[in-house]
Design a protein with these regions (language model features):
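Long, compositionally biased terminal regions
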Residues: 1-37, 41-87
Length: 87
């Protein structure tokens, strides 16, 4: 997953700390819309991970039909939370 490329795609920059609140909200809305339209499971998972890192991801259990995707989402959440705790 190339999070920087996705940040640039949806927010116009990889450094979202520099964004005005309204631009951040606009990017989140675009990201959520793309997530809702996406049918490819790998791409959908990548978008979900980015939303999780931004604090706007939906609950993975009702979101992912495939058990493997749900498990991967929970593993990603645990990994990301560990890294945040260690920082």
């Amino acid at each position: 997953m190339d999070f920087d490329a996705q940040l640039i795609r949806f927010f116009g920059t990889a450094d979202i700390d520099t964004l005005a609140p309204e631009r951040l909200l606009e990017g989140v809305k675009l990201l959520q819309m793309q997530f809702g339209l996406e049918r490819d499971s790998d791409r959908r998972f990548e978008l979900w991970c980015l939303m999780y890192m931004l604090g706007v991801a939906p609950d993975p259990d009702p979101t992912f039909e495939d058990e493997a995707d749900r498990e991967a989402a929970h593993e990603f959440m645990a990994m990301a939370d560990r890294e945040i705790d260690e920082a």
